[in-house]
Structures are given as structure tokens and as C-alpha cells.
Amino acid sequence: MISLDCDYNNGAHPKVLQRLIETNSERTGCYGFDIYCDAAKKKIMEACQDDDADIFFLSGGTQTNATVIDSILHSYEGVISVDSGHINTHEAGSIEFTEHKIINVPNHNGKLRADVLENFMENFLADGNNMHAVFPGLVYITFPTEFGT
């Protein structure tokens, strides 16, 4: 069974809370340049088997969504999202700032239905003038949705 879950609908694991208590009074460098990020970078380099990898951490979801979506799409592509999708309603224009269009399709209780996506793609591909349109290059799906579904 596939289960797409998030970190917002449960409390922290007791070991995480304990570690926060243990390190609460520590003074470290700023985020990305502290001993914990340095240790994480080393582990990522080991996992990637690349001692020269450049590792950067992002501090929030908006920055992450904008960076990842921009890195995936070509300049002529956009991202399909339901009209109520997080990137369309609560990302403060960050996707558009990267010069990519959010291509809206209707939501059903906050979710993207496969038949809606299939219908959109069939119509897009059948359009003889689609070379003048933003091409869909990515589909954005979230859980939970903005409606909590």
C-alpha cells in the first residue's frame, strides 16, 4: 500500500524531543553552517559516494517547492496543480517568481483526480495550437490538501 503522509499531522517522536531538550542550551553557528548541518552534509556525501558534493539546506517549504519545481521544469513548462493547491494559494507567488506558470485544474475535495488530469492532457495534446501554450512538465500533489483531505 502506498501511503503519502506528512510531518504536520503527528507529534514529534520522543527521541526527537529528548534530543531537543539535550541540545536546547547549545550555541551553534547559523543554520547550514552549524555542527549538525556539517554532520548531515558528511552523511549525504557518503550516501552519494561524492566527497566533493555541494550540499545546501533549505529552511522552509516555500523555498523548497520553488527550488525543486524550477530545477525540474524547462523554461517553457509549467506545473499542473488543482486550483486549491498549496503552490497556487499559499506560496506567495514563489513559483511564478521562477517564471513558471501554475496550470490550474479543478479540485475535487482538494484533490486531483486521475480522470481530470487525463482529460486535461488529452485536450492539451489534441490542441493544434499547443505550441503557443505553456507545456505541462510536472504535476503537483500534496497531502494533506488545503482542505485537510
Q: Locations of the language-model features?
A:
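Short polar catalytic/cofactor-binding loops
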Residues: 8-11
